[in-house]
Amino acid sequence: AIISGVVAGGAGTLFYFGMTLVTLIRTKHPWLIFLLPFGGLVIVGCYRLLHDEHDTGTNLVISAIHSDDNLPLKMAPLIFISTLITHLFGGSAGREGAALQLGGSIGNGIGKLFHFDDKDKHIMIMCGMSACFSALFGTPMAAAIFSMEVVSVGIMYYAALVPCVISSLVAHGIAVSFGISQELFLIDSIPSFGIGNAVRISVLAILCAGISILFCVMLHQSEALYKHFFKNPYVRVFVGGCIVIVLTLLVGNQNYNGTGVNIIAQCIDGTVRPEAFLLK
């Protein structure tokens, strides 16, 4: 667990600095958005170069824990490079998924290196996920729990709890030693809890659940449509990049490109536009 925390935590720390750098470059040079389709071509080329043409992302990490699917170590540099390229040119790829894939592939590689059995190797995958997530977001306890939860909704792998916590804390220590601090969103006051607020929170929870379901359905359906109309992955990614450019031009700004941290800050400040969730 300590080794996983050091290695995956180091990778997560490097990933953090990489994300910070490309975001800064994109912010200073907004014209980079017009190179997004070409960045997509580079990403597809990288995956094909390493013979990983059918990558399934985070799903592959989860499958590796459940059904012993092969989780190649080459996924680490692929997800690292492709995520940085995506954000450099204005794409919006979630850092959470990248952290899980990066850490999971490193954890699996460590498990293979020490010839662990399947059970211990699965724990190492979760340790790697926890470590990378912790280093990137600065939330060691949340990283440990999240990595165990995401593997199977409603089921907790308690045998992995202590190793994941250790990996997360080690990774967090490494990140802090390099000067990384977690992003804080301060709330001035919290309203008292009562019947009225309970009803509002319940309605909000239902709406968020509905939007989440709709978002997942749209992701799967759009992927199927892209593959149906554009068989060639190079054409597919180029068209996708062009669509993002058109949407960005229609919105008139790049507030919805990249990580979306600015949108979270606006939500906390109460200055966010009502349709921001839909535009994002």
Model-found features: residue ranges?
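Alpha-helical transmembrane segments and immediately membrane-proximal extracytoplasmic
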Residues: 1-280
